[in-house]
Regions:
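Extracytoplasmic/periplasmic substrate-recognition and gating elements
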Residues: 17-18, 114-115, 240-304
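A structural signal for short loop-to-beta-strand junctions that line the ligand-binding cleft
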Residues: 37-40, 46-47, 75-111, 139-140, ...
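Hinge/lid segment of periplasmic solute-binding proteins
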Residues: 52-104, 118, 127, 154-156, ...
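Extracytoplasmic/periplasmic solute-binding protein
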Residues: 94, 127-180
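Conserved C-terminal helix/tail region of periplasmic/extracytoplasmic solute-binding proteins
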Residues: 113, 299, 313, 327-421, ...
Length: 456
């Protein structure tokens, strides 16, 4: 199972080329471990599963059913910093990250030069640069704070010195292995929110930024109305094609020292079904697939281009086309983002509270802590499936679950034709009652996955 359809287009053909004699089926999933919990409830946990948004706390219910990589050679191919947050309470490594993507500030160097603004090399200089642009009527930073991932990023990036401190690492290790609730170090998190609030002020973010989505933020930057945006290398490449300007990358700066860091998101996190260990041939194939994915070519395809931070000792980091981060990369000053599922909603509520003026730093911290440990309400079943259909490919009808869903959509729309990409469908249909959220998991969530209906 691959967490998004882009991987079906990029890495799947390469894997099939490497193993032409192996019958390997790939299915698009969703970026949520709940999908795999749903499969496990019906004894259909896939052999290989992947997600991007992940924390050990999100996969607690899957822990008894996942293989421990620690006893296999593949772990020795990873830098120690890359797996430090991947050990569970039993000291097992059930998940592995596959290549990192730098998510840092993208700066319009041409605009910096035009206004005589120095490219910042520490936090103090970043603050000065923001003030100079603000004084000249240019928005310093058009971050898309209407999106949950950017709110998640801004807390960790603003206080990156705290998250990389001994206290921060200790908290992160505990948060990644928490069973019932995530415990918070009040002293640490009050500092984190103090620095988050300061970063928002220093960057001249305000209430209006709550409504800036990714398209608006990009447009402001592309039109020269803001001096900085943020994103991964592919975003920078796309912007460079649109803009008649020189773009460079700026790392995130610690507010407590002169250190700077690359904020990094794993392209995906991967786990194996424990049952693979009962079938040596299947396990060897799965390990071969993993080796293929962490190879140099595999990482390029997964990361979709240049700007790949290799997490493996035998594969070089591919950052030749991503200037501005050389020192941080050479020093391994790389921070792997915390991406527990609940942290995105929690960050959005807290940061929006600060921006709107409705919360002070303490209230924002209390809100984040509350949302992180909020228990999900028990969901009632909304539909009862009378029949069962598999998502697996068969020789007769293709994918029965996909056919059933698409036929239902066609009939509900009184249409003669319904058309969708094969990777639109993610899950089998299981007989019996099902909740609305589980029904929602049966189709992919990628924005470029279109569905068409037509009356003929």
């Amino acid at each position: 199972y691959l967490w998004e359809n882009r991987l079906m287009k990029n890495i799947v053909p390469y894997i099939h080329e490497q193993f032409p004699d192996q019958d390997i089926e790939f299915i698009t999933g969703n970026n949520d471990t709940d999908l795999y919990s749903y499969f496990k409830e019906h004894d259909e946990l896939p052999d290989i599963i992947t997600v991007r948004r992940f924390s050990g706390t999100d996969a607690q219910d899957l822990q008894p059913y996942l293989m421990d990589f620690a006893s296999y050679d593949v772990v020795s191919k990873y830098y120690s910093y890359a797996v430090q947050y991947y050990k569970n309470a039993e000291d097992e490594i059930q998940w592995l990250p596959i290549c990192g993507i730098p998510q840092t500030i993208i700066a319009n160097k041409t605009l910096f030069d035009q206004y005589g603004v120095k490219i910042p090399e520490n936090y103090e200089e970043y603050v000065q640069a923001c003030q100079q642009f603000y004084d000249n009527g240019i928005k310093p930073y058009s971050m898309d704070l209407g999106e949950d991932w950017s709110n998640n990023e801004i807390i960790q990036a603003a206080a990156i010195g705290e998250f990389t401190s001994l206290d921060g690492i200790e908290w992160r290790n505990g948060a990644e292995t928490a069973v019932d609730e995530v415990k918070f170090d009040d002293a640490l998190w009050k500092r984190i929110f103090s620095e988050t609030s300061q970063f928002l002020k220093d960057s001249h973010f305000g209430k209006e930024d709550i409504n800036i989505d990714v398209d608006t933020g990009i447009q402001m930057f592309a039109e020269g109305k803001s001096a900085m945006f943020h994103g991964h290398p592919t975003v920078m490449q796309q912007l460079q094609k649109q803009m008649d300007a020189e773009l460079i990358r700026i790392p995130y700066f610690s507010q407590t020292s002169d250190e700077s860091y690359v904020y990094m998101t794993p392209s995906l996190n991967i786990a194996f079904n424990k049952n693979l260990e009962k079938d040596r041939e299947k396990l060897d194939t799965a390990l071969d697939v993993l080796d293929c994915m962490i190879s140099e070519e595999g990482q390029k395809l997964i990361a979709d281009g240049s700007g790949v931070i290799s997490l493996n000792t035998d594969v070089p980091t591919m950052m030749q086309d991503v200037p501005g981060l050389e020192e941080e990369i050479n020093n391994n000053a790389v921070y792997i983002r915390y991406s527990a599922q609940k942290s995105f909603d929690a960050s959005l509520e807290a940061v929006h509270g600060l921006l709107s003026g409705e919360m002070d730093e303490i209230q924002a911290y209390d809100t984040l802590r509350s949302v992180m440990n909020r228990k999900a309400p028990e969901e009632k079943a909304t539909v009862n499936f009378e029949n069962e259909y598999s998502i697996s490919l068969n020789d007769r009808n293709g994918r029965d679950a996909a056919s059933s869903i698409l036929t239902t959509i066609r009939e509900e729309n009184d249409a003669q034709l319904a058309l969708a990409p094969y990777y639109y469908f993610t899950s089998s249909i299981y007989k019996g009652e099902c909740t609305n959220s589980r029904v929602g998991m049966m189709t992919a969530k990628s924005s470029d996955t279109a569905l068409y209906v037509a009356k003929i």
